[in-house]
């Protein structure tokens, strides 16, 4: 267990009692052991009909995925259906925040992390450990390093303002952070690759977490083989470089994510404005209740009905505030978190584009070196060389002026170019295989993200709807009880 891999995991022997988690299931990818361990020449084992975390009966073959804009093919050969995403067989709960070393300068908040799972990689079906916020940060940072092709869920921000004001131990801030960490844990638990990571395994059940962290730091996954691309990337690849032949699948993925973010941002803006208006309305009802209480003191004959009416107004004001805190605020927090998750997915697609750009630029560089080598060979044999660029022409003229443009110099340059061409050919082959492997993994990651997005949107909208219905039902019941009392009021004119 020196690296964050899954060599000891039996993918095809899941217990039959485990509920299946349906998701796309192409043949096992090298990315399941981290991108560093990609071996393009290694054979891929066949996938079973159904194993833990996947449902192959609903997925198409990996070879069916083509360069097409068809959504079915782009998502790995099947339509994504959130109703089949059944990830409850691994449940992680972040709860019971507690202050540690209270009163000292080293005080921090720890959270109880309870895990229930039937995964065979866990020693116990139920474990409870305590982790602090920095432990979650450590987990995400190292998952990103070990699985660069995976969409690792974002971690909540540190909220610097609360650190400056000293409010990071307030109950409101701690609860808000706990909910954010709960979303992070849920996404990790439902991800069919990340939840099998050895680091996640240690995080969720190790009682010696500090030892496990140091062990993981001291035994990182093996680095990828050094290649020419590392030394040349800074030379000809920069922030302004663009992929010459964009893959239609990933172009549409990016556009789809951007449309989703734009739509969700609009919804978030509208709901946020509604929240502000509800706050204003609650304050108005509170002021009106005070006015009716004052009127009740003036009208001695109907003091009790007016006071009861004022109390119901206060109750309704409290009900509106309660709805904002328990329904609208969680919906806004959930939508903001989902926007961050989508942005993380887009960053992974950008990284895939960078892999393709590396391949394209290396190929172009190899072509230029081969052309120059052929030109020198033609000159050495006495034939007329092909037309050259301005830079090559100026260099040849300078060589002539220095007297270095002779047959021996050309042969030495050709010998060096032969070695560089061989090195570039190996680098181009590796870059091509890496780009293809990364692309296949991103296709699967997009399908996982679609399932997670649909599940989270369903839960958020369900909670939002239930909260609205509960508030309206409670308001109707309260007003129905007070209306008969108001109807019995008789005022002498």
Curated annotation (Swiss-Prot):
It comes from Cryptococcus neoformans var. neoformans serotype D (strain JEC21 / ATCC MYA-565) (Filobasidiella neoformans). GO terms for molecular function: phosphatidylinositol binding. Belongs to the sorting nexin family. It is found in: Cytoplasm, Cytosol; Preautophagosomal structure membrane; Endosome membrane. It is a peripheral membrane protein. Its main location: cytoplasm. GO terms for cellular component: cytosol; early endosome; endosome membrane; phagophore assembly site; phagophore assembly site membrane. The PX domain binds phosphatidylinositol 3-phosphate which is necessary for peripheral membrane localization to the perivacuolar punctate structures. Sorting nexin, involved in the separation or division of vacuoles throughout the entire life cycle of the cells. Involved in retrieval of late-Golgi SNAREs from post-Golgi endosomes to the trans-Golgi network, for cytoplasm to vacuole transport (Cvt), and autophagy of large cargos including mitophagy, pexophagy and glycophagy. It holds the Pfam family PX. Keywords: Autophagy, Cytoplasm, Endosome, Lipid-binding, Membrane, Protein transport, Transport. A 1,2-diacyl-sn-glycero-3-phospho-(1D-myo-inositol-3-phosphate) binds at residues 132, 158, 177. Residues 1-67 are annotated as: Disordered. Residues 37-48 have a biased composition (Low complexity). GO terms for biological process: endocytic recycling; mitophagy; piecemeal microautophagy of the nucleus; protein transport; reticulophagy. This is Sorting nexin-4.
């Amino acid at each position: 267990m020196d690296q964050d891999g899954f060599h000891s995991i039996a993918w095809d022997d899941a217990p039959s009692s485990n509920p299946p988690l349906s998701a796309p299931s192409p043949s096992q990818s090298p990315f399941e052991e981290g991108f560093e361990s990609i071996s393009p020449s290694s054979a891929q084992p066949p996938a079973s009909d159904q194993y833990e975390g996947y449902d192959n009966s609903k997925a198409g073959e990996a070879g069916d995925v083509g360069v097409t804009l068809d959504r079915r093919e782009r998502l790995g050969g099947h339509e994504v259906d959130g109703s089949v995403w059944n990830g409850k067989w691994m449940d992680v709960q972040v709860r019971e925040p507690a202050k540690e070393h209270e009163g000292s300068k080293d005080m921090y908040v720890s959270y109880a992390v309870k895990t229930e799972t039937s995964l065979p990689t866990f020693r116990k079906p139920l474990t409870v450990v305590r982790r602090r916020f920095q432990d979650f940060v450590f987990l995400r940072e190292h998952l990103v390093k070990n699985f660069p092709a995976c969409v690792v869920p974002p971690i909540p921000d540190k909220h610097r303002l609360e650190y400056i004001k000293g409010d990071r131990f307030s109950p409101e801030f701690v609860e808000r952070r706990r909910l954010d960490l709960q979303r992070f844990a849920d996404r990790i638990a439902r991800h069919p690759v990340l939840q099998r990571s050895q680091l996640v395994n240690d995080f969720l059940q190790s009682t010696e977490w500090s030892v496990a962290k140091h062990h993981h730091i001291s035994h990182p996954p093996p680095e990828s083989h050094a290649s020419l691309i590392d030394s040349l990337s800074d030379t000809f690849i920069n922030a302004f470089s663009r992929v010459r032949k964009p893959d239609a699948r990933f172009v549409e993925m990016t556009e789809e994510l951007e449309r989703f973010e734009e739509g969700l941002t609009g919804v978030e803006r509208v709901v946020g404005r509604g929240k502000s208006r509800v706050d204003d309305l609650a304050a108005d009802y509170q002021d009106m209740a005070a006015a009716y209480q004052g009127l009740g003191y003036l009208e001695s004959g109907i003091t009790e009905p007016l006071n009861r009416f004022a109390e119901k107004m206060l109750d309704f004001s409290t009900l509106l505030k309660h709805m904002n805190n328990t329904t609208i605020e969680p919906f806004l927090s959930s939508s903001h978190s989902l926007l961050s998750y989508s942005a993380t997915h887009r960053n992974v697609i950008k990284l895939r584009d960078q892999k393709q750009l590396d391949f394209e630029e290396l190929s172009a560089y190899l072509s230029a070196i081969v052309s120059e080598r052929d030109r020198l060979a033609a000159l050495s044999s006495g034939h007329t060389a092909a037309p050259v660029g301005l830079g090559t022409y100026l260099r040849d003229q300078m060589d002539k002026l220095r007297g270095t443009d002779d047959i021996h110099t050309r042969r030495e340059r050709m010998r060096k170019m032969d070695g560089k061409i061989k090195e570039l050919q190996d680098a181009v082959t590796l870059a091509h295989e890496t780009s293809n492997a990364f692309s296949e993994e991103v296709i699967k990651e997009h399908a996982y993200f679609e399932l997670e997005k649909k599940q989270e949107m369903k839960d958020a909208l369900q909670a939002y709807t239930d909260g609205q219905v509960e508030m309206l039902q409670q308001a109707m019941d309260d007003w129905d009880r007070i209306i008969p009392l108001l109807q019995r009021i008789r005022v002498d004119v």
